[in-house]
């Protein structure tokens, strides 16, 4: 009886540690599934650095503003090369923004993206520039060594 309680306690502690390990910032507060009306839908282009370009259409991107003039965005169900075996949701946190009328101007450098529950340091986001209006979103950044652009509309 005593051993069963110890095993249960250890199992509970292990589950708690695993749950805490999966917490990695604001990205857990973003919508798990995009809502069609709130997401931008567009094309993402990734320069493969071998003279070819990989294009993925119908990419959904959503964002969340924070009070400290940063935002997070999520690119849903994306892959960055035709040989990539699966699609993933990529979260980019801590993008700086400024506001001019109804336009947000974005910038960021040295941002580690999250995907599949963990950080992807190899694909650190650098030279991020972009803009968001009520109807359009445009992004340009380096994802590791790969130049990426995105253009979407609502």
Task: Label each PLM-derived region with a short phrase.
Residues 78-129:
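Contiguous, well-ordered beta-strand patches that form the walls/edges
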Residues 42-53, 79-86, 113-121, 141, ...:
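Flexible, membrane-facing loop/turn or short amphipathic-helix motifs
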Residues 2-5, 18-43, 142-154:
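Bacterial Sec-dependent N-terminal signal peptides
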């Amino acid at each position: 009886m005593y051993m069963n309680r110890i095993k249960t306690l250890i199992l509970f502690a292990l589950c708690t540690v695993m749950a805490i390990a999966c917490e990695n910032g604001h990205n857990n507060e973003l919508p798990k599934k995009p809502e069609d009306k709130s997401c931008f839908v567009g094309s993402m282009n990734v320069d493969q650095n071998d003279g070819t370009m990989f294009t993925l259409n119908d990419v959904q991107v959503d964002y969340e503003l924070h009070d400290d003039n940063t935002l997070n965005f999520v690119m849903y169900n994306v892959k960055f090369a035709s040989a990539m075996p699966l699609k993933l949701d990529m979260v980019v946190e801590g993008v700086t923004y400024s506001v001019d009328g109804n336009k947000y101007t974005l910038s960021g450098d040295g941002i580690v993206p999250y995907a599949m529950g963990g950080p992807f340091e190899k694909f650190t986001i650098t030279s991020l520039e972009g803009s968001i209006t009520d109807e359009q979103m445009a992004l340009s950044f380096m994802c590791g060594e790969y130049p990426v652009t995105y253009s979407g509309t609502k």
